[in-house]
Amino acid sequence: MNNHSPTIGTRLYAQLVSLALWQKTIWVLAALFLLQAHTAQAASDRGLLLEAQKDGQTVYLLGSIHLADKSFYPLREEIERAYKSSDALVVEADILAMESNAALQMQVMQESVYPPGEQLKDNVSPEVYGQLLEWLNQRQIPEASFSRLRPAIAMITLSLIEMQARGLDPKAGIDRHFLSQAHRNNTQILELESVLGQIQMLNSLDNPELYLQQTLEQLSDMDSFVPRITSAWKSGDQEKIYDLVIREGLDEHPEYGPLYELLFYKRNQDMAKKIQDLSGQHNTLFVVVGAGHLVGEKSITELLEQDGFTVKQI
């Protein structure tokens, strides 16, 4: 088993909910890998659920895995009860609303690809593009499917395909589970970010070619990452989730510090501030964000505690 930490693309996909929208854009590709869904019951799995309270207001914080499988369900009764007792569902981005918004889908597509006449191979080294071609050949995916993708989007897309090949599915994601309920029952849905904003943030990364190359070189690490992150989430183990999503990557690649600052710590500050503001307008909120945002130093959880919330895992 490879002892390296999971690829940066894997970590990004696990934490950026908007990238589940690519299931529509590349569904033909994803269909190449039929998922083997597990049937084990999950009602006794703990999951990562925290309760934050301040001045009589309650905020439930559920750490999401944006790709999951049937073995995650049914969720623990306490999780479903917390959702049903809340006034509103708070998510990073409402991907279900986006799926019915053709104009937004077009904006996302325009942000994700190069303009006509410009291609991915023109913007990365021949070495990196050769690595991508080798992977495409192995997966029997046409080069044209990736030829105009921007580097960061290509990195996330191939990570999605590899994670799906290992049995995880965006349609089974924890956030999507609650969004489906909320849309069905007309529950108020509030967004901390936006789909388009997350895509634009990815495209603003410095040196995305480096992250694409690192992802291509360490794809085999997903073989160990998928069962490890699944186990960590089901047991509600905050330390293991932190190790997998953040600490191991920074220990192995300290040069990625600015990347983590942008994708985790800056976003944590922005999301924590918005949660604080929303909590003043509702008695009870049910917040679903990527699990990596709730664990460790400079997490949403820590920032809420600094603002006077009392937080406990339940």
Predicted regions and their residues:
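Alpha-helix C-cap/termination motif
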Residues: W22, A82-S85, L278-Q281
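Boundary at the C-terminal end of the N-terminal hydrophobic targeting segment
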Residues: A40-S44
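Short hydrophobic "helix-edge" motifs at membrane interfaces and signal-peptide entry regions
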Residues: V28, Q53-D55, G280-Q281
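Bacterial N-terminal signal peptides
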Residues: A20-A37
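A cross-kingdom marker for long, charged
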Residues: P258-I314
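Structured, acidic catalytic/metal-binding patches in enzyme active sites
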Residues: L49-L259, L263
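N-terminal secretory signal peptides that target proteins for export/translocation
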Residues: M1-L21
